[in-house]
């Protein structure tokens, strides 16, 4: 068995009090002694590597986020579907959960790549990760990094002549829906993913793309190109993931890469 399967088997052998304690430590803060045993089993499966994908939507009536499995979405009538706007895909896997935007960022003229910016600047509040640093794969601080990057570079021209932080700004300003086009303004707090979040996307790219393409064809799938993360390697390079092979590499901040924003879901839940 894999390490994760071993971990799940160990959890299943514990009594409920012990299971609750371990799951709370992992991050399932809503789990308690009153949680049904059937839900405990689902949490344990997730802790052991369960992949769960669903459509992330905004209900037009009140702006609340609602999530649908593919089966649930497909079972809705056209009239009921019209009550929701799809904004992306919620992924729950490897003890993470977040929403992946339904499309890559584009600029004002339709361009799909952005420079990272801040070339030659070591940004305060954004930790550098060198080669071989295993902590890179666990990073989940994309929103914090995005905010720090934008604050530090606002109106500042870097050593290559780039003003600001185009990739982080594109992620922050992303809108999955607008008042003008859709009748509802997207107020989701999007950000440039951490490398850990981007690696999770790469790991499950095939499954994510299957869900995306089931409703919009191939126009908005995760491509095979390089995608920026919000994690720096040093003052001149930031980490990327090459989605074709899932390679993880630092990329010069003067180069242009794709941006797929994500949004946090604060507490782990079923």
Predicted regions and their residues:
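Short, compositionally biased
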Residues: 2-186, 253-255, 262-270
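C-terminal, surface-exposed recognition/capping segments
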Residues: 2-22, 195-270
């Amino acid at each position: 068995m894999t390490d994760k399967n071993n971990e799940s088997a160990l959890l299943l052998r514990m009594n409920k009090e012990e299971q609750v304690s371990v799951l709370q430590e992992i991050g399932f803060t809503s789990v308690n002694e009153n949680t049904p045993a059937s839900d405990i089993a689902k949490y344990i499966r997730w802790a052991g590597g369960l992949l769960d994908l669903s459509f992330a939507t905004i209900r037009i009536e009140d702006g609340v986020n609602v999530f649908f499995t593919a089966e649930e979405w497909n079972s809705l009538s056209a009239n009921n579907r019209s009550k929701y706007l799809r904004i992306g895909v919620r992924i729950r896997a490897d003890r993470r959960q977040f929403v992946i935007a339904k499309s890559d960022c584009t600029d004002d003229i339709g361009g799909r790549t952005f420079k990272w910016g801040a070339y030659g600047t070591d940004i305060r509040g954004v930790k550098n990760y060198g080669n071989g640093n295993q902590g890179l794969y666990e990073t989940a601080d994309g929103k914090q990094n995005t905010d720090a990057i934008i604050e530090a570079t606002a109106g500042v021209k870097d050593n290559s002549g780039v003003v600001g932080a185009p990739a982080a700004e594109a992620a922050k300003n992303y809108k999955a829906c607008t008042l003008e086009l859709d009748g509802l303004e997207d107020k989701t707090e999007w950000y440039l993913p951490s490398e850990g979040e981007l690696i999770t996307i790469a790991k499950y790219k095939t499954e994510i793309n299957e869900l995306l393409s089931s409703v919009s064809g191939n126009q908005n799938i995760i491509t095979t190109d390089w995608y920026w993360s919000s994690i720096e390697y040093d003052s001149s390079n930031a980490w990327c993931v090459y989605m074709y092979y899932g390679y993880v590499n630092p990329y010069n901040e003067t180069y242009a890469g794709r941006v797929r924003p994500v949004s946090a879901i604060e507490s782990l839940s079923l």
